[in-house]
Amino acid sequence: VYATIRGYGDYRTGKGPYNDWPAFDIVAQAMGGFMAMTGEKDSPTKAGPGIGDIVPGIMCAFGVIAALRKAEQTGQGEFVDVSMYDAMIAFCERQIYRYSFVEDVSHGEGNDHPLVNPFSIYRAADGWYAIGCALESQWQALIKIMGLDELKDDNRLNSNDARIKNAEFVRKTITEWTRLHTKAQLMNKLAGKVPSGPANNVEDIYKDEHLKVRDMLQDIDVPGLGKKKIAGVPVKFLRNPGSVKSPGPQLGFHTKEVMEQFGIKNMKDD
């Protein structure tokens, strides 16, 4: 079983006009429609993390695992091909079906959701706070916590469709409450009742006790630099917990070992 990740795929799995073109993360994000869905209207916006690289890698890993399982059953090998462009199309699948069903063309959703409201970030006293109410019961819980029970029967807000039509009023109503509280206060008030959480920066992440318990900030020894923290392993196994044991090898670290496999020995250090 072997695999490739290319910008636009291998000829063997689908020959198109782009197969030989080079690509990077930003190109995959742009062509796959991700940037059109992100940011404000008519202002395509790139994601901070390199998802145009990361998503194809994750999909390729799943493909290799599936191919290995098939090889165990049949004794036959397989070639796994992942296109960065294809991966971003699959990642942004909502735009595909919405265009087919209702001819909707995404022009930047900002921090809102086109089908659910409220589902955004709101100004807090010391930053921003995310709130998402996908269920009516969650909306009812939110207005109760805000002390606005009278909104339960307000025709502008008594259904998800109504809230989508009156999105600006919803935002104004929620923001008038959230901006009176810090992110920590909002967490205490909403925790376990309404899906919500602070818009963290990396300093906030380093202080989060939950991540420490989850072992998501792991220490590794970096040659010449000592102990440094990196992101931990998000896939947890109960019987065989995993961790990051060491940093990635430096350039040329395995050159001697690889060359010796081909019978080339007594190599100079350079």
Summary of predicted features, one role per range:
Residues 1-129, 133-134, 141:
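Active-site-adjacent "lid/gating" segments in soluble enzymes
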Residues 51, 129, 174-176, 243-246:
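Active-site rim elements
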Residues 55-62, 136-140, 168, 184, ...:
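A structural signal for well-ordered alpha-helical segments within the folded catalytic domains
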Residues 117-196:
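Aromatic-enriched alpha-helical interface/lid elements that frame and gate functional surfaces
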Residues 153-165, 200-209, 267-270:
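Short linear loop/turn motifs
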Residues 191-242:
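A glycine-rich dinucleotide-binding beta-alpha-beta segment and adjacent secondary-structure elements
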Residues 221-269:
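Flexible, small-/acidic-enriched active-site or ligand-binding loops
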